[in-house]
Structure formats: C-alpha cells, structure tokens
C-alpha cells in the first residue's frame, strides 16, 4: 500500500522528509563565508566581505557560468531558483574551459547550485547575471554555501531552527534580514543573535515563524574584534497554501 501524499501525525518531521505529507516540503539552507574581515557587515555566502547583490534580480534574466580551472571542463552544475512568477525552476549548465556558458532560463531568484556529474570542482565556479556574480561554488566544495533563501509563490515558509558558528577566536553579531512579500526594497531584521568561536549559536523556535510567499531571507554577520570563517544555517518548512 502506498501512503504517499497522506498526512501522518506520527513522526511528522520524518514523513515530511519522506515526501509523505501532502503540500509540505522541508528545506535546509546552509552557508559559510571563508574569511570575513574585522568590522565588516556581510551576507553569509561564498563571496567574503560582501552583501548579497539582490538588486541584480530586479528583473528576471539568464545566468552565465564560468570556471577558473580547466579540469572542471564538462562537469554539470544544477542551479535552483525561481522564475519571474516566483515559481520553482532549475537549469543544468555544462561547464566549458573554452569560455563562458550562457543559460536559457530566466531566473528571478537563485539560492542553490551544485555539481551533478564529474568529480568535485577543482577550481572556483562562478555564475553571473548582468555582469554581477550571484552564485559561487568554492573550489573543492561541489555546492554553493549560501544562507539566503526566497519563498516560492503559493507557499508559506515556517522557520523552525537556526544555527551559526565562528572560527576559534572570531566573534560577530548576526542578523536574519527578511524582505516580506518582496514589497519595495526594504529588508528588516527578523531575528538576531551573537556568535563566537567559544560556542555555537543554536536556536529552536518555540513556535515556527511564518514567512509569506515571495519573501527574501538573508543572514548577515557584523564582525567585531576578530575576523575568521563563519557559518550559518536554518531549517524552513514550506506549506502549499493552495491545498
């Protein structure tokens, strides 16, 4: 007997992950900044000391892929994001050592990229939109490390859990910025925390925090006395509001 798409009260979280809860999808977002300088504010993603360039997606458009090492020629990277109507989409790019590769799918948002063929990337892989770098896969990782996300159309995201860590000796103030419903250009703080190399920040929300469709999430850190490598991650449950 198949139980797919039926709601189970017992072990709800496990059954969401098993795709057995109708209209519910879990998403684990995780990011890292390789080395953030002292007294800087930056998004937690693969490009250190920079805020994520959301303005690059004021309009939807195609991505351009480029590699830094010829050994990555022929490998395939899958990009996940949203189209102009904020629906989930993806596109596969076959990397080339002879030049950049231009995609055919128009993205309104991107939030993950990863290799689906070949060995882990030898060199850095970059994706640009309109000349602005919007995705980076650091050498040897095979996957973007981005603590950012955008909630698709028709879904409400429920934030369950957030964590952050700092390299030994480093410390920072963290902010989860949210742009609700993508209204205007204003991000505001939805959650804040402190993190240091002596202890991981680990917070489970007593009640899952709702984030409406077409909202952007951007985890940022402001470093203080010491620089270093920082990580951040969060777990979000997407619920289809049309069911």
For each predicted feature, which ranges?
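Beta-strand-centric surfaces of beta-sandwich/beta-rich domains
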Residues: 2-109, 116-243
């Amino acid at each position: 007997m198949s139980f797919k798409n039926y709601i189970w009260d017992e072990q709800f979280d496990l059954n969401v992950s098993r795709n057995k809860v109708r209209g519910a999808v879990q998403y684990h977002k995780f990011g890292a900044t390789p080395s953030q300088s002292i007294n800087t504010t930056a998004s937690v993603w693969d490009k250190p000391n920079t805020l994520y360039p959301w303005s690059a997606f004021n309009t939807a458009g195609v991505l351009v892929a480029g590699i830094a090492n010829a050994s990555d020629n022929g490998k395939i990277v899958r990009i996940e994001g949203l189209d102009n109507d904020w629906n989930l989409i993806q596109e596969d790019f076959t990397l080339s050592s002879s030049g950049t590769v231009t995609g055919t799918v128009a993205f309104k948002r991107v939030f993950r990229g990863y290799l689906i063929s070949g060995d882990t990337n030898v060199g850095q892989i970059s994706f640009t939109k309109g000349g602005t770098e919007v995705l980076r896969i650091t050498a040897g990782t095979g996957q973007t490390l981005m603590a950012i996300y955008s909630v698709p159309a028709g879904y409400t995201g429920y934030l369950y859990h957030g964590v952050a860590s700092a390299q030994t000796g480093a410390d920072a103030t963290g902010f989860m910025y949210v742009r609700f419903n993508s209204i205007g250009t204003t991000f505001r703080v939805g959650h804040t925390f402190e993190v240091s190399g002596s202890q991981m920040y680990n917070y489970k929300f007593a009640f899952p925090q709702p984030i409406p469709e077409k909202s952007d999430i951007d985890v940022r850190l402001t470093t203080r006395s010491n620089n270093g490598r920082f990580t951040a991650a969060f777990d979000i449950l997407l619920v289809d509001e049309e069911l």
